[in-house]
Amino acid sequence: MAYYKGAASEGGRAAQLMKRRELAQQEVEFRKKKIEEDLKVSNIENKFAAHYDAVEQQLKSSTIGLVTLDEMKAKQEDIVREREKKLAQKKEEKDKEKLKALEAKLAEKDRQKRQIQALSFDPDDEPDGDDANDGDEGSGKESEKEDVKEELTVVKRSWKEQVPSGVKKIRKNPDVDTSFLPDREREERDNRLREELRQEWAMKQATLKDQEITITFSYWDGSGHRKSVAMKKGNSIYQFLQKCLEMLRKDFSELKTVMADQLMYVKEDLILPHHYTFYDFIVTKARGKSGPLFNFDVYDDIRMISDASVEKEDSHAGKVLLRSWYERNKHIFPASRWEPYDPTKVYDKYTIKDKSKK
C-alpha cells in the first residue's frame, strides 16, 4: 500500500479531496439512475396516453347522435379490443423484423467466413505471433457467432410463444350436449312454430265460436213459458237476454219497458253473469248444481233419486226472469236454491233439494 510522504496537513487535505470526489461520484450515479427511471415511467405514460387518446379519437369519430350508456360501453370495449389487436400485430411484426435482421446478420457472418476460408495462405509466410493472433481472432469470431445464435434462438422462442395466443382457435367438442346453450336459429325456429300453433289454435277457436246452437229457455214468472232461440257459441249471456227480450215483449206486457240489464239467466240452479259466453261453459265443460252448463238441449227431469249417483249430460231449460221477481221470491223454492256462478266451485253430484234443509 502506498503512503503519502509529506506534511500531515497535506495528507489530511488529500484525504478530504478523495472523500469529496467519492461523494460527488455517488451523487452523479444516483442522479443518473433517477433520470433513467423517470425516462422509463414517462415512456410508459406516453404509451398509455397515446393509446388512450387513439381510443378516444376513434370512439368520437364512430359515435353519431345520442346513444345509451350500454351502447357506448360496448362500442368502447370493441374499439379497445381492436386497438389491442393492432398493437399485438405491430409487436409481432417488429419481432419478425428483428428475427429477419438477426438471420441476415448471421448469414452475412457465415458468408464472410466462407470467403475468408476460400482464400489460400502459406503458413510459412506468417510469423508465429500472427498465427497466435489469428487464433485469438478466430476464437473471438466463434464466440460472437455463438452469441448471435443464442440471441436468435431466444427471439425465435419468444416469438413462437406469442404467436399461438393470437392464432389458436377454440374449437367445440362435438360430443358435448349444447342444447342448453342459447341458439338464435333454434330460438327463431321455436318462435315461428309457436306462432303457427297459436294462429292455428285461434282459427279453430274462432270457427268454434261462430257455430250456431239452439238454446231452449223458459220465461219464469212463477210458472214456465218455454221458448227457443238460435245463438252463436261466442255470444254472451247479455246478448242472449237481449234476443230473448225481443221475443218475449210480444206476449208479456210487463217486459215492454224492461232492459236486458234487468233480466237474469238461471241455468242448473246457478245465476250466470252477463259477461260470460256460451263458449266459456262449453270449453270448460262447466257443471251446475242440477246438471251440466255446457249442454243447452232439454230433456226430462234428471234429478230423480234413483239417478242421483249417475253422471249424465242431460240438462234443464234455463230460466229467464226479472231481477225484481227474484228479489221478492228468493226465500221461496225454487229461487231459494239459486246462487251466483262461481267457476272455482266444483259440483260433484247433482241434487234435487237444498241440503241445508232436512
From Swiss-Prot:
Q: InterPro entries, alphabetically?
A: FAM50A/XAP5_C, XAP5
Q: Name one Pfam family in it.
A: XAP5
Question: What is any one of the record's Gene Ontology cellular component terms?
Answer: nucleus
Q: Where is the composition biased (Basic and acidic residues)?
A: 104-113, 138-151
Q: Where is this region: Disordered?
A: 104-151
Domain of life of the organism encoding this protein:
Eukaryota
Give start-end positions of Acidic residues composition bias. 122-137
Which biological process terms from the Gene Ontology are attached to this UniProt entry?
chromatin organization
By sequence similarity, the record places it as follows:
Belongs to the FAM50 family.
Its protein name is Protein FAM50 homolog
Q: Which organism's genome codes for this protein?
A: Anopheles gambiae (African malaria mosquito)
